[in-house]
Amino acid sequence: MSVSFEAKETNRGVLTFTIGQDAIKPELDRVFNKVKKDINLPGFRKGHLPRAVFNQKFGEEALYQDVVNALLPAAYEAAVAEAGLEVVAQPKIDVVSMEKGQDWTITAEVVTKPEVKLGDYKNLAVSVEATKEVTDEEVDAKIEAARNNLAELVIKEGPATEGDTVVIDFVGSIDGVEFDGGKGENFSLGLGSGQFIPGFEAQLVGHAAGEEVNVEVTFPEDYQAADLAGKQALFVTKIHEVKAKEVPALDDELAKDIDEEVETLDELKAKYRKELEASKEVAFDDAVESAALELAVENAEIVELPEEMIHEEVHRAINEFLGGMQQQGISPDMYFQITGTTREDLHKQYEADAEKRTKTNLVVEAVAKAEGFEATEEEINKEIEDLAATYNMEVAQVRSLLSPEMLKHDIAVKKAVEVITSTATVK
């Protein structure tokens, strides 16, 4: 194989390589033996057409496209490796020549990884808003939330107030004409919950069971049903019941109802404090990591980040997200239908942070290289075992799905993140 690379501009160039006859000839034989099985030619049994007759009738060139398609991926990877390139986007391939009996010449327009000039990445001083401290108010709020979950709705005499639940019938109309989806019976609506369009719930406050209320609202301009968006509507609403939330007393019995592992309210408070401390410590560490990585990227210089890298990161993130949805039994089509969005919407959503993620990845990889981080066999095995446990898969199955090189890369990157984060101090 002959390989050459010509740089055209920063992080871009043309890779030229050949595919030799030593690879072409056996692949020609394989492709011919495959296609001849389907050829019907008078005078020859199906699948027994001589090669010479095929070449005379169709020309050997008829096989070339299948041959180059089969050989190109491995040949391209070998050429990239021989040229010592780190390609970061899909290449633009051009078959320059496929002459009979000659080596074939291929060119690939490639985008290469940009140079990263590291600045300070150790012993960084960072500021974070997160704190590890847990206050009494936070513990009380957690207990109050659990207490509210045990609340019961009881019939209330008198007018409804914010926070009450009303049981209603309603019929909606626009200019006196009822519309689809505008009718409901015995519907439980929490006042202040925001379940209905803006202004609806507020107009029921102050009214009691047995009353009929004419609720006048305007559908938002961005309402999901385009035929209703921006239009004024009247909902004739009958209130059947008004219910108020009745919360249990704040005592030891409540504590036991909330958590069967405790006997007293003080024990519940102590348990909740530990849980909050653990979660806040994780949040604090995440905040420090994020701030340290951001500062390390800010201190580095990335020489002309290719736009293609950002696009690749967007596609990677989307595929990872949709793959996660698929594991939960939600197909991409189902997700877009449920959310009322499109793949283009998802692309815009991820595009906003793609440049930041791409720069962070480049800097972290550069740190791993500068520090000489590598993965040991023991670390690789542990990573596979951890992934198997996370996704409830067999270790052997995970091992078969992941390439050793990818695992080595991920482990080295984790070490780089650790050295950036662990040496950082909070101002």
UniProtKB/Swiss-Prot annotation:
Key word Cytoplasm present: yes
One Gene Ontology cellular component: cytoplasm
Enzyme class: isomerase
Enzyme Commission number(s): 5.2.1.8
GO biological process: 'de novo' cotranslational protein folding; cell division; chaperone-mediated protein folding; protein transport; protein unfolding
Subcellular location: Cytoplasm
Catalytic activity line of the entry: [protein]-peptidylproline (omega=180) = [protein]-peptidylproline (omega=0)
All residue ranges annotated as the PPIase FKBP-type domain in the record: 163-248
Classification via InterPro entries: PPIase_dom_sf (IPR046357), PPIase_FKBP_dom (IPR001179), Trig_fac (IPR005215), Trigger_fac_C (IPR008880), Trigger_fac_C_sf (IPR037041), Trigger_fac_ribosome-bd_bac (IPR008881), Trigger_fac_ribosome-bd_sf (IPR036611), Trigger_fact/SurA_dom_sf (IPR027304)
Gene Ontology molecular function: any one: peptidyl-prolyl cis-trans isomerase activity
Function: Involved in protein export. Acts as a chaperone by maintaining the newly synthesized protein in an open conformation. Functions as a peptidyl-prolyl cis-trans isomerase.
NCBIfam families, A to Z: tig
Domain statement: Consists of 3 domains; the N-terminus binds the ribosome, the middle domain has PPIase activity, while the C-terminus has intrinsic chaperone activity on its own.
Listed HAMAP family: Trigger_factor_Tig (MF_00303)
Protein name: Trigger factor
Organism: Streptococcus suis (strain 98HAH33)
